[in-house]
Amino acid sequence: MNRIWLFFSVMFVIGTDTFLLSPLLPLLQDQFHVSTDLSGWMVSAYALGYALFAFIAGPISDRLNRKTVMLWGLAGFIVSTFLCGIAPSFAAMCLFRFAAGVSAAFVTPQIWASIPVIVQPSQIIKGMGIATAGLAASQMLGLPIGGFLASFTWHTPFFVLSACSLILLLILAAVMPGIRPSEPLARPSIVNPYRELFSLPKTSVILLAYFLFQTGNFASFSFLGTWLSADYHLTVSQIGAAMLVLGLGNMLGSLIGSRVSEKLGMFKTLISGMLLMGALYFALPFFPNLFLVEAGFFLTFFTAGIIFPLMMGVFQSIAPNARGTIASLSNAAMYAGTTVGTSIAGFLYQSTQHFGAVTGFTAILFILSMTLYQTISKTGKRQSTARAQL
């Protein structure tokens, strides 16, 4: 399991860059003199780059040494993140964020795809929970630290993050084992793995359910900083500190999620968690004070930490021989959802000037996603019953 903690570190730096824009968005909006709906494109550009290139990264990584792919991806991530720190304009920032997303698309799928290979089958969910905890830790520590660094200048968080990523790159190059494909013959086409996956009936349903969830999730998450700045008049460092409990909840949830799912069952835990998250997101703008908002942050992302590894487990169960492709597909769905969700949320927020329009949109998408996961669960039970009767 020691190797999993190395993945934890990679997910921490990638996650910090992914989530960093939420507390910085009000500051960068003023810096580049853009409206609320346009400011969301600094988040969407990263997500779009990731979503587009994740489709290529998965099949390629299934034919190459995953360590090599991860190192080159991380090198590109370091350069593009540094360039974000010197972006002279809104357009340049969006371009460099797009490049950072492209680079990250070649890193994180290697983590999700490698975990089932390097740990025992009984430890897969736990391993994914630890990797997910890296994302949660980036919210708990990376966001407030980024907010604190941004109190000096908005450039600083990007410079520090690229320096930390460089150190991690050197460590990975020295100690990370090579993970070569189990099948030595390369597939003739990048398209073929996706054709094979989508020939399975459950692939499209799982993909759509996850896309809807992440569209709703990032619609609200991306504008939390803007909302806290507008309604509670918090500074960028205060926004980062306010999000400390958000990351704490996510990390704790990801660490105990495997125990909860063992007791309640995977799909029961997943569906119940989505229902709770939807209710909490919807209620956020109506809480009367910041203390209750903080409590809502904790509970919402504690639940998210529990259910996210389960979603990854559902994805990885589709086709064990194409884990890299599946991991890229799931990440592409997440960042496509981020692009769509952030764009729609920016429009809703700008039009209504009320965060409740955004969280209401999130709640509706969670209900739709939950319905699809229920369909997947029922189909799986019917298939299990049919096999038992044969």
UniProtKB/Swiss-Prot annotation:
Domain of life: Bacteria
Keyword Lipid metabolism applies: no
Stretches of the chain forming a coiled coil according to its record: none
GO molecular function: transmembrane transporter activity
GO cellular-component term (any): plasma membrane
Keywords: Cell membrane, Membrane, Transmembrane, Transmembrane helix, Transport
UniProt xrefs under SUPFAM superfamilies: MFS general substrate transporter
Protein name in UniProt: Uncharacterized MFS-type transporter YceJ
Species the sequence originates in: Bacillus subtilis (strain 168)
